[in-house]
Amino acid sequence: MARIRSFNLDRWSEPDETPVLFVAVCQDESLPGCNDTDTGLALANMTDAAWAHGVGSCIMGAIDRPAIKELLGLGENLRLHSVVAFGYPTHKSHLVAMQNGNVKYYLDDARDYCVPKRPMEEILLKTL
């Protein structure tokens, strides 16, 4: 359980809702050209492939990087980009309007995930 707490999952999930796999996504900063674009493409491919097999995922960027790096024994050259949790969905996720700049996910009364997002009008620079 201590390991799961490093991912702050104990406050979200019931015992039968814990993900079955965690993947720590790292960037090797000793290599030239390592960037967030490549990492984002890798994340998209992993999560899309999982979903094609009925496995849900959650890309987590708001994580305790120092604690997870220590837990995994990651070297100094590795930057922990994110962690992906994989599992079999028991809840639905809904996009909801972001309120007062708050991007924290929350559970509704049905224990479904509410994912705050900014409205399109705020993020589009120009429409044609």
Feature locations, PLM:
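Acidic, surface-exposed loops and disordered segments
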Residues: M1-L128
